[in-house]
């Protein structure tokens, strides 16, 4: 895995102005999502997170604010916070969220935030936690969650248990993890890791297979294809999955 400075520089270089053509189509930067339309995706995420409308909520790895914009539109009385280590992306987020008084962002690592214990009703990740040690990220999220608060994880996972992958599929998975410097697990492994950490109760787990066409086109048409050696022939069997937990 790369260090924080590398990830910050990487996002500032490749995920700001160079993805403008993608931003014109979607502000929600995910490889897997049920809906390409941001409004529909926002409504789906709100339902998956079980947002009531009066909570204090944190997005860890908020990108350019696309998810926050949709959720803040749906829930104007909810207090939304977003953190990101990329100052370049947060500059874009300022414009995306300029009309929302219930949204604020700051430059922070989700592995070591400056929030007090028991601060948030909901903490969520949308394809962002794979850049860091899973256990460290989870422990920090649990720390800043209120008692009975909810943790939502929306992530890239393998389509089946890792031990059921063929040698070629496993080789492609390892290549993906190395070239994108992003940890990917199967659903069972994520659930087992969370159980081992403790302090959370699984409410629900879902899976979805639809890749984002906008995201795939962005990878094909930008420098991301070259720097990650992205080819159809070495794509591992991946899908999207989400997990909703309650702090106990």
Question: What residues fall within each predicted segment?
Answer:
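Acceptor-substrate binding/catalytic loop of class I
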Residues: 173-189
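Conserved alpha-helix/loop element of class I SAM-dependent methyltransferases that forms part
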Residues: 35-53
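A short glycine-rich, Lys/Arg-flanked "PGG" loop and its adjoining helix->strand segment in the class I
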Residues: 135-150
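Class I SAM-dependent methyltransferase SAM/SAH-binding core
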Residues: 64-112
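N-terminal, positively charged/glycine-rich alpha-helical extensions of SAM-dependent methyltransferases
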Residues: 1-27
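Conserved class I S-adenosyl-L-methionine
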Residues: 54-63, 152-174
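A short acidic, Gly/Pro-enriched loop at the edge of an enzyme's catalytic core
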Residues: 111-123
């Amino acid at each position: 895995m790369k260090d924080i400075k590398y990830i910050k520089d990487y996002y500032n270089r490749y995920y700001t102005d160079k993805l403008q053509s993608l931003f014109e189509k979607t502000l929600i930067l995910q490889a897997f999502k049920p809906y390409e339309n941001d409004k529909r995706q926002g409504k789906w995420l709100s339902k998956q997170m079980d947002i009531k409308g009066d909570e204090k909520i944190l997005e860890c790895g908020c990108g350019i604010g696309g998810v926050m914009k949709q959720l803040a539109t749906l829930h104007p009385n909810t207090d939304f916070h977003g953190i990101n280590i990329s100052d370049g992306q947060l500059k874009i987020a300022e414009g995306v969220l300029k009309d929302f008084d219930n949204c604020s962002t700051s430059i922070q690592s989700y592995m070591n935030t400056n929030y007090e214990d028991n601060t948030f009703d909901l903490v969520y990740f949308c394809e962002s936690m794979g850049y860091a040690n899973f256990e460290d990220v989870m422990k920090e999220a649990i720390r800043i969650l209120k008692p009975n608060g909810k943790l939502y994880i929306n992530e890239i996972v393998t389509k089946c248990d890792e031990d059921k992958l063929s040698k070629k599929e496993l080789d492609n998975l390892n290549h993906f993890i190395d070239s994108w410097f992003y940890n990917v697990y199967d659903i069972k492994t994520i659930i087992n890791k969370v159980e081992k950490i403790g302090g959370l109760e699984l409410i629900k787990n879902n899976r979805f297979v639809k890749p984002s066409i906008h995201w795939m086109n962005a990878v094909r048409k930008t420098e991301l294809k070259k720097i990650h050696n992205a080819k159809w022939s070495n794509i591992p069997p991946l899908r999207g999955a989400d997990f909703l937990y309650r702090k106990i």
